[in-house]
């Protein structure tokens, strides 16, 4: 099984393997097999459209965790210029599961903050698999307060299974760090745009997710608990995760219908990992447009709008 494809994508993987095989044969024998390759590519595109046109919530949850999916630093590289990463919470240490710093979106200085997972084993461990400890959230808070001080908009990228639940994180008051961020972000006198690019896991996501505009990529998720966790609680087995994913309403379209998400950002055919540059270009356009809209509001109107947004959640 090709590790770059999930199990429900295997028919696509098989076609891609045939295309690569034909290309190798053509290179070795100087044969003109362009027509056959083009036919298979068209067939692959049609098959991809068919499969991705009827994804279940569980399949979308798995896409959100795809190992090749672009992470925050990938999007920073494509979307922004002059990124200068800042480190440390000025209390305990630096947390590599949260990255942040000053950058430019076109000519506009912005503060960019996001969760960061790892690709290889060592980086996964260093980034703690994208699960921040309290110092990560306190670093994010420090950068957000700096952004307010220098009148820079804040752009956050959410992609985490959740806040780290380890003993050391609890000893340093994980819940307080998250709660403090919610308080601070609700009062910041600068525009905040949050974009869920992969997993939006519980309070670990919400701690950098209080905003004026919430975006979700088409194949991202946002939930109070993972489908496996929910299934383990309700059905006493993680095998019911597909049922839990459907019942929880974790997908972008479902959350848009509930009024929680403002914008669902379309991904390239097959997901953002198939064409990261195209995905980044789409996000960049949305961020620029939304930022231009929010900058028209004065601080009083911005905070009133944010307060109304927060108070509208729930029944």
From Swiss-Prot:
Family: Belongs to the AccA family.
Entry EC no(s): 2.1.3.15
Domain CoA carboxyltransferase C-terminal: 39-293
Function of the protein: Component of the acetyl coenzyme A carboxylase (ACC) complex. First, biotin carboxylase catalyzes the carboxylation of biotin on its carrier protein (BCCP) and then the CO(2) group is transferred by the carboxyltransferase to acetyl-CoA to form malonyl-CoA.
Encoding gene per record: accA
Protein name: Acetyl-coenzyme A carboxylase carboxyl transferase subunit alpha
Superkingdom, natural source: Bacteria
Assembly with partners or alone: Acetyl-CoA carboxylase is a heterohexamer composed of biotin carboxyl carrier protein (AccB), biotin carboxylase (AccC) and two subunits each of ACCase subunit alpha (AccA) and ACCase subunit beta (AccD).
Keyword terms: ATP-binding, Cytoplasm, Fatty acid biosynthesis, Fatty acid metabolism, Lipid biosynthesis, Lipid metabolism, Nucleotide-binding, Transferase
SUPFAM superfamilies cross-referenced by the UniProt entry: ClpP/crotonase (SSF52096)
Enzyme category, top tier: transferase
Gene3D superfamilies: 2-enoyl-CoA Hydratase, Chain A, domain 1
Signal sequence range: none
Xref: InterPro entries: Acetyl_CoA_COase_a_su (IPR001095), ClpP/crotonase-like_dom_sf (IPR029045), COA_CT_C (IPR011763)
GO MF assignments: acetyl-CoA carboxylase activity; ATP binding; carboxyl- or carbamoyltransferase activity
Keyword ATP-binding: yes
Catalytic activity: N(6)-carboxybiotinyl-L-lysyl-[protein] + acetyl-CoA = N(6)-biotinyl-L-lysyl-[protein] + malonyl-CoA
Subcellular location: Cytoplasm
Upper lineage: Bacteria, Pseudomonadati, Pseudomonadota, Gammaproteobacteria, Pseudomonadales
Annotated metabolic or biological route of this protein: Lipid metabolism; malonyl-CoA biosynthesis; malonyl-CoA from acetyl-CoA: step 1/1
Main localisation: cytoplasm
GO biological process: fatty acid biosynthetic process; malonyl-CoA biosynthetic process
UniProt keyword annotation of S-adenosyl-L-methionine present: no
One GO CC annotation: acetyl-CoA carboxylase complex
